[in-house]
Amino acid sequence: MRPFLQEYLMRRLLHYLINNIREHLMLYLFLWGLLAIMDLIYVFYF
């Protein structure tokens, strides 16, 4: 019974992580893009 419960919890955790990544992927991309733009501005102007 216990391995089944562990497998169920792992699957729940995996689904939670996948949904979380899918929801926040655009936010992560936006932040990385902003960081890249700031880096380019710093390189070109300083």
From Swiss-Prot:
GO biological process assignments: response to acidic pH; single-species biofilm formation
Induction statement: Expressed during exponential phase (at protein level).
One family name in Pfam for this protein: DUF2770
InterPro entries reported for this sequence: DUF2770 (IPR024494)
Protein name: Uncharacterized protein YceO
Record organism: Escherichia coli (strain K12)
Gene name for this UniProt entry: yceO
